[in-house]
Amino acid sequence: MKRLITYDIIKGNDYSKLYEFIEKYKGIQITESTYEITCSLSLDVFKQEIRKVIRSNDKVYVISVNKDKALFYTKV
């Protein structure tokens, strides 16, 4: 499934683990803080993996495109 990750990491928090996550899934940069990732993980597992690399006060959203080309988004 194709997913877009968009984020706003709170000033002073570390971006490096999020960038490692994005690189692990060969993310394609769309804008300064938006990446496209294609993977087979379920949305719940995908969100759990992202939560491991951010802090609770960071803002991260995932926009998914399903096989029917429908869009939906969720806050991580």
Which sequence ranges carry the predicted segments?
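Hydrophobic residues in beta-strands and at strand termini
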Residues: I9, I37-C39
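Short connector loops at helix/strand junctions that flank enzyme active sites
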Residues: K2, I30-E32, N57
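Short glycine-/aliphatic-rich beta-strand segments at the starts of folded cytosolic domains
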Residues: M1-I9
